[in-house]
């Protein structure tokens, strides 16, 4: 899914959507006042997702692993629910094949 324009900008709107969703969740997590035991795990995995979105190089297993770790760390925090849902939806969109299915 590595689609790039000149200047390094990612051309695929799904990848841009992932980057925007991850940025929103990172911002909301940064200002969330509660002490979260797995905050560092969530922050690390959000950084991984952000890096993949910036590069446009999306590894499906890694995307899903990071999403699971973030959801496990933050899933019980209702204030972050909408932003987390946006990240999940963006990961799902990035995982959808637009071309012919492989291996089947």
Give a label for each model feature.
Residues 1-75, 92-104:
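Short amphipathic alpha-helical segments that predominantly mediate membrane engagement
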Residues 77-80, 84-90:
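Mature extracytoplasmic or organellar-lumen-exposed domains after removal of signal/transit peptides
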């Amino acid at each position: 899914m590595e689609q790039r324009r000149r200047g390094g900008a990612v051309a695929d709107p799904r990848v841009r959507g992932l980057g925007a969703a991850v940025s929103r969740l990172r911002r909301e997590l940064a200002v969330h006042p509660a002490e979260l035991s797995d905050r560092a795990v969530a922050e690390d995995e959000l950084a991984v997702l952000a890096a993949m979105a910036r590069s446009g190089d999306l590894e499906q297993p890694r995307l899903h692993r990071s999403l699971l770790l973030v959801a496990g760390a933050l899933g019980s925090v209702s204030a972050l629910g909408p932003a987390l849902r946006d990240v999940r939806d963006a990961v799902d969109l990035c995982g959808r094949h637009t071309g012919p299915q492989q291996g089947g």
